[in-house]
């Protein structure tokens, strides 16, 4: 069973600024649950695209029923991104490495320059929540995770904008 969340957001910053801020968005006051972000691999290919693979460690509170299942409040996330300056496109994919017997969350994001205003960036996000659990428990896990994801998505966008203001648009 799979639950899906989609989101489209317009950021008030150019694609160049957003793609630069993307790589340095942690830490920020809107992502206190991100304990660490470590680069595992980074390279530029022959066409000038920047590939990055990072390990994120996130920590947070779980509902009582989930803490009984997991007995841990940390999660390890793999993030892969490709920044293509020639297309002015940033694509990212993130997914959890642990707790996959309970829930797998896969998030895809695409950042492109707005065709109407070059000082804005469009972000399309699709997140998939897949749980192998049965007897209604999988549905419950997906529903909770989907709700939390939707709540944290706006916080994530605010964090990125915070980094943009602090590092790329100083007053």
Curated annotation (Swiss-Prot):
One of its GO terms (biological process) is phospholipid transport. Keywords: Membrane, Mitochondrion, Mitochondrion inner membrane. The keyword Membrane applies. It is found in: Mitochondrion inner membrane; Mitochondrion intermembrane space. Residues 2-171 form the PRELI/MSF1 domain. The keyword Membrane applies. It is a peripheral membrane protein. Residues 1-79 are annotated as: Required for mitochondrial targeting. One of its GO terms (molecular function) is phosphatidic acid transfer activity. GO terms for cellular component: cytosol; extrinsic component of mitochondrial inner membrane; mitochondrial intermembrane space; mitochondrion; nucleus. Required for maintenance of normal mitochondrial morphology as well as PCP1-dependent processing of MGM1. This is Protein ups1 homolog. It comes from Schizosaccharomyces pombe (strain 972 / ATCC 24843).
